[in-house]
A protein has these predicted regions:
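Left-handed beta-helix
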Residues: 203-204, 209-356
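Short histidine/acidic/glycine/proline-rich micro-motifs that form metal-
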Residues: 113-115, 145, 268
Length: 356
């Protein structure tokens, strides 16, 4: 059977201030007055029925997710004792689904992307499901790049495989290149953006975890033996303490020989940075601004105003300004991808850590 797994435990730190620890990005209402999480569930429902839609998150967000997704069975919401990156949360979800269904196929979706082109999106995932079953492959969805983007990973397309879609073996992955490399990838035309969406059988991904992450696999199998038992939560917590967290890209996808990519013919945006989010603000004389902003003689600025005060920009350029009420961020636009390092430093400063 086909199951959707929605990854909803991240904190969205690159959108700091708009996305906070207590209100991360997946709960933001940016596009249509619905949260990214709700849009993700509604988008996949025509392909996968609600009973087969699962969400994995951490304990801090459990009640918030139950409130957002009141029509999703609470038993379908998995929680992790701590964040150990995507390979771990996918592995944990895989053993839980495999326990109930030996033929489980997982459609893994981030909870915080914006997608337009519903039919093409569902058709692409349907083709990925077919390849995952027929070839026992690990399939990811690639997006045709429209600009030299340094905030995304890239996938080089290899040999095309017989399929109704544009499906290829993966030649290699490149994680977030610099601007010159990104420009070169765009010109070559053989590279796709890595969307972070995956399709695979639960048993296949677990075999690949066993092969490339044997220590993690051992912990997952120990948890598997206790699923449904009284001590499941305790064992999960203990085994998570032994796991070295790693992303599914670094841990499995860049190593496996079972990797395929399908080119998705739909509009996709990972609104994971202020530069990305500014594409959805109002255009004003080569600037992007929200409500409660007045600017004059400014160039290439993105200004996110709050509800209680007016932000005035005068004679500045290449800035991101964010008003979150208790914190105001002023940042050079070129630092967009470096904000995680800044937040780590602030978090280690006792008098400021509470603002993260």
């Amino acid at each position: 059977m086909i199951y959707a797994l929605i990854l909803a435990g991240g904190k969205g730190t690159r959108l700091y201030l708009l996305s906070r620890a207590n209100q991360p990005k997946q709960f933001l209402k940016v596009i249509n007055n619905k949260s990214f999480l709700v849009n993700t569930v509604e988008r996949i429902t025509p392909l996968i029925k609600k009973d087969n839609i699962y969400v994995i998150t951490n304990q801090d967000y459990l009640s918030k997710i139950r409130g957002e997704l009141s029509d999703v069975n609470s038993k379908n919401i998995f929680t992790e004792p701590e964040n150990k990156e995507t390979a771990t949360c996918i592995g944990l979800s895989a053993i839980k689904l495999l326990k109930k269904d030996n033929d489980a196929v997982m459609v893994v979706l981030p909870s915080d992307h914006h997608i337009e082109g519903q039919k093409a999106y569902l058709d692409t995932l349907s083709e990925a499901i077919e390849i995952a079953n027929r070839r026992r492959g690990i399939v990811t969805i690639g997006i045709n790049p429209t600009r030299p983007e340094t905030g995304y990973g890239y996938i080089e397309m290899g040999e095309r495989i017989p399929s109704g879609a544009q499906a290829y073996k993966i030649a290699r992955f490149t994680e977030k290149p610099n601007i010159e490399v990104a420009k070169d990838f765009l010109l070559k035309g053989t590279y796709l953006w890595n969307s972070g969406m995956f399709v695979f059988r639960a048993d296949v991904i677990l075999r690949e975890i066993e092969k490339y992450l044997p220590k993690m696999y051992k912990s997952l199998m120990n948890i598997y033996q206790h699923i449904g038992e009284e001590d499941e939560e305790e064992v999960t917590r203990e085994e998570y303490g032994l796991i070295d967290g790693i992303s599914i890209d670094f841990g499995v996808m860049q190593r496996t020989r079972k990797a395929y990519v399908i080119k998705g013919d739909f509009k996709w945006d990972d609104i994971g940075s202020f530069n990305a989010l500014s594409r959805y603000l109002n255009e004003y004389r080569n600037n992007k601004i929200s409500n409660n902003v007045y600017i004059q003689d400014c160039e290439n600025c993105s200004i996110f105003g709050g509800n209680e005060k007016l932000i005035i920009g005068f004679g500045v350029k290449d800035l991101v300004v964010v008003d979150a009420g208790d914190v105001i961020l002023v940042m050079d636009k070129d630092k967009d991808q470096e904000i995680k390092h800044l937040l780590n430093d602030i978090n280690e400063t006792p008098e400021f850590g509470a603002f993260i």
